[in-house]
Amino acid sequence: KPAVKTKSVFSEQADQILYQIRRFGSKMATAYSMTQDSKTSGEQAKCLTLLASAERIFYDRLDDAIRSASMFDETEYNAFCRGSISFGDKEEAKKKKEIYDGIVSTVNKVVHDNERLILRLDSLAYALNQRSAQNPWDTDVVLAMTKLDTVISKTEEDIKQDEEISKEAMKRYDTLNGGN
């Protein structure tokens, strides 16, 4: 948290992330509570697995944002944007800009991914709360679980893709710094 909060470039995202953490905790507590009332052990097991995955993904993404923001040199970035400093030739400057843009993009993507996760979690909790006692496998619950599972899977794919992009960016960064 502090790494994101101390950099003005990320102040809006930091506020959103803090708000998301509070909401996520509340939604998880509600969903866990509603899961305890599940009518079948199959539904309960599926919900608990999804909730554990949602929690892992949410906090992994927060970790990504914090790590990315920690790497961000705001002083250098601001000087670069003002034109006070340059990084040699245009190619080096372009690579450096791509790195900065990538870090900002990662933090924004985490906020987006976690918001999407919270909304799906909310839908699941609502469906669990509204389900009919006569039909333990209420279609709304199944649909909400499926949508949450889809968001989790999509986010996991995005994380893998982000890791590949980061590896490439770090290779470029290493070449910029002479391999140090």
Positions of PLM-derived features:
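Soluble C-terminal extramembrane regulatory/interaction domains of multi-pass membrane proteins
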Residues: 66-180
